[in-house]
């Protein structure tokens, strides 16, 4: 195990990480999947700029507003980063691992240099609906790309990724996503010091399928694997215990989101997640879960 964390400005000693947010999205861009309005009232959101006045509506239909799905201005990102630093924050892991959802290694480095924050970049395919043909490569080809970004640099930069993820698993868990999960696992095995984060369809129970590939078929060490978006399954204690007993981490990352994810479900309330986490602690799992609050779209800035 290496005793440092790879950031966009270079290695940082583990003891210097400080207060860390292990899974955030600073420059993600979801504009490729702007959707049609789900409700009559949300027709008005399509062409509007994000403001406090329409936040209530965006919480119910966030994907129909182009401005809400667009990349965040760097000035806004720096403003929020400085707020985090003022509260004692030292490190953020950016889980945007693919250009298909707006990864921008140069922008991450610029923010790190301007704020002094430790920022970790990530590498790996996201959901197939975002990746399109980019995900239709062999397992070895996908793994080679991740390995290159971990050890040499992202794209034509010398900025190295420090996490594998977040690897996309959609509600339908496509064959291409199966293979990208295998590729990410292979890259992790070749870089055993690097952690791996998996985007889970939180309202479903695909943990066994995912871990059968990652742990069973590919042989990744479970303590290097975290399952994102565990909040919606919080009341299914048997399912969550089954995942934790395999040795992986659960991430509770919808804290404070308070939105509807169209065609998937409604994010649990803060109290629901707090109760779920407290119960797992009572059951002896205090060291196998992580809390964070993912910033996905403009309405949360």
Residue ranges of model-derived segments:
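Active-site gating/metal-coordination segments in enzymes
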Residues: 90-91, 110-114, 118-191, 249, ...
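Divalent metal-binding segments
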Residues: 50-78, 96-100, 104, 166-174
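Short acidic/histidine-rich active-site segments
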Residues: 197-199, 252-255, 285-301
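Structural preference for beta-strand elements that scaffold enzyme active sites
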Residues: 19-20, 91, 118-120, 161-163, ...
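Acidic (Asp/Glu)-rich catalytic clusters
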Residues: 82-86, 107-117, 150-159, 186-190, ...
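Histidine/acidic-residue-rich catalytic or RNA/ligand-binding cores of hydrolases
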Residues: 30-32, 104-105, 204-213, 235-244, ...
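Active-site gating loops and adjacent loop-to-helix segments of metal-dependent hydrolytic enzymes
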Residues: 25-71, 124-140, 294-301
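Divalent metal-binding pocket/active-site signature
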Residues: 155-234
């Amino acid at each position: 195990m290496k005793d440092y964390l790879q950031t966009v400005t270079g290695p940082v000693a583990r003891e210097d990480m400080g207060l860390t947010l292990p899974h955030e999205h600073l420059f993600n861009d979801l504009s490729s999947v702007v959707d049609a309005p789900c409700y009559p009232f949300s027709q008005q959101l399509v062409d509007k700029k994000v403001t406090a006045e329409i936040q209530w509506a965006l919480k119910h239909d966030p994907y129909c507003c182009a401005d809400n799905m667009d990349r965040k201005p760097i000035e806004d990102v720096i403003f929020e980063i400085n707020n985090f630093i003022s509260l004692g924050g030292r490190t953020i892991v950016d889980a945007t691992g693919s250009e298909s959802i707006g990864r921008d290694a140069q922008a991450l480095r610029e923010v790190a240099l301007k704020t002094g924050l430790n920022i970790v970049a990530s590498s790996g395919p996201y959901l197939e609906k975002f990746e399109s043909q980019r995900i239709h490569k062999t397992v070895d080809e996908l793994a080679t790309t991740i390995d290159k970004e971990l050890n040499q640099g992202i794209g034509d930069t010398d900025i190295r990724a420090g996490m594998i993820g977040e690897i996309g698993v959609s509600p339908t868990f496509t064959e291409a996503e199966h293979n990208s999960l295998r590729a990410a696992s292979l890259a992790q095995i070749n870089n055993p010091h690097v952690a791996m984060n998996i985007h889970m369809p939180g309202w479903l129970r695909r943990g066994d399928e995912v871990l059968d590939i990652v742990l069973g078929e590919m042989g990744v060490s479970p303590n290097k694997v975290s399952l994102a978006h565990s909040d919606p399954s919080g009341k299914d204690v048997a399912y969550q215990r089954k995942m934790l007993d395999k040795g992986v981490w659960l991430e509770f990352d919808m804290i404070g989101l308070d939105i509807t994810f169209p065609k998937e479900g409604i994010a649990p309330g803060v109290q629901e997640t707090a109760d779920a986490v407290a119960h797992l602690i009572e059951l002896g799992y205090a060291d196998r879960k992580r809390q964070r609050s993912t910033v996905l779209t403009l309405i949360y800035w």
